[in-house]
From Swiss-Prot:
KW Ribosomal protein (keyword) present: yes
NCBIfam families: rplX_bact
Pfam family, one: ribosomal_L24
Protein name: Large ribosomal subunit protein uL24
The UniProt record lists the keyword rRNA-binding: yes
Natural source organism: Gluconobacter oxydans (strain 621H)
Length: 106
């Protein structure tokens, strides 16, 4: 399946505690159908110190969100949009914003 949301994209959270928040995608996990978004779904993790120099304590980190709860923000208009695909004349398959028809780079 082609990736509609990729690392570095700006997305809008559609549901959950962080509903309405925009953020940048830090990582995508295609097999789990989840993504990690900066500043969204932040959880506190209690960690023990380890020998490799890692300090213990309470660490805040972003947790994965299901891709169905995210919507890509169109880079041109700044509004959330659905994503489609189009094959260009040179044979490349590119992502396209459904709302504006603009090609999404990346």
């Amino acid at each position: 399946m082609a990736a509609r949301i990729k690392k570095g994209d700006q997305v809008l959270v559609l549901s959950g505690k962080s509903r309405g928040v925009r953020g940048e995608v830090l990582a995508v996990m295609p097999k789990a159908e989840k993504a990690v978004v900066r500043g969204v779904a932040v959880a506190k993790r209690h960690t023990k110190p380890n020998r490799m120099g890692g300090e213990g304590g309470i660490i805040e980190r972003e947790m994965p969100i299901h891709l169905s709860n995210l919507k890509l923000v169109d880079p041109k208009s700044g509004k959330p949009t659905r994503v489609g695909f189009r094959i260009l004349e040179d044979g490349r398959k590119v992502r396209v914003a459904k709302a504006t028809g603009e090609v999404i780079e990346g």
